[in-house]
Amino acid sequence: MQALKLVADHGELSSNNATTAASSAFVVQSGLLYLACSSEKKSGHISVCNTVAEAGIGSFHVEKGNGFLYRYGHPAHAKVTAVTKGATTVMTIDHVDTKIQVGDYVTMTGSSVGTYNSTVAHVEVTAISDPQSYNAYTKTITVDADTSSLADFTGTAQISKSVIARLAPETSDGCTMHVHEVNLA
């Protein structure tokens, strides 16, 4: 067995009955989760998705008292160099080769204007422009975030693909799942 290195501890998802539970949004760092199902309750199903409405799509069963290694995605990041404010937000990125796609959800970090970090937090990508000679080969990413009332963006920041984990207990006895993002050591 290959050793695992902890990248991030995303906490635990727990339900005392058959009600589903969802995590807060988290940035995809390695794309590999180690899930440990507590032996105190019953088994459960786990999925990683963009919204709580997608629960159960591509879910995996984890037996109580067992662990499960789950490759759920790949990291995707882009450096933001400019922002056009509005009811939707258009961000200019510094490199045309990003793995962020329309339909992904992203979170901004590192903005010197802190309200951008909290406003562009797990929001949907609605459009991506193609770099062409007429636009100096720049690429823009449009997200569903209203930044019209924020101060002007200055400096740089980063957007990263973000997701949520969703737990569906197997029975009305509930389930507790510990969620750890790992990398192979």
Question: Model regions: which residues?
Answer:
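Loop/turn positions that initiate beta-strands
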Residues: 65-66, 103
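Short beta-strand/loop motifs in extracellular/secreted proteins, especially
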Residues: 31, 41-46, 104, 175
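Short, surface-exposed beta-strand/strand-loop-strand elements in extracellular ectodomains
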Residues: 36-58
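Short, intrinsically disordered N-terminal pre-domain segments
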Residues: 1-24, 147, 173-185
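Asparagine-centered strand-capping/turn motif at beta-strand->loop junctions
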Residues: 29-41, 169-171
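Extracellular and analogous surface-interaction loops
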Residues: 21-29, 94-99
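Beta-strand-rich, repetitive solenoid scaffolds
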Residues: 36, 47, 69-73, 124-128
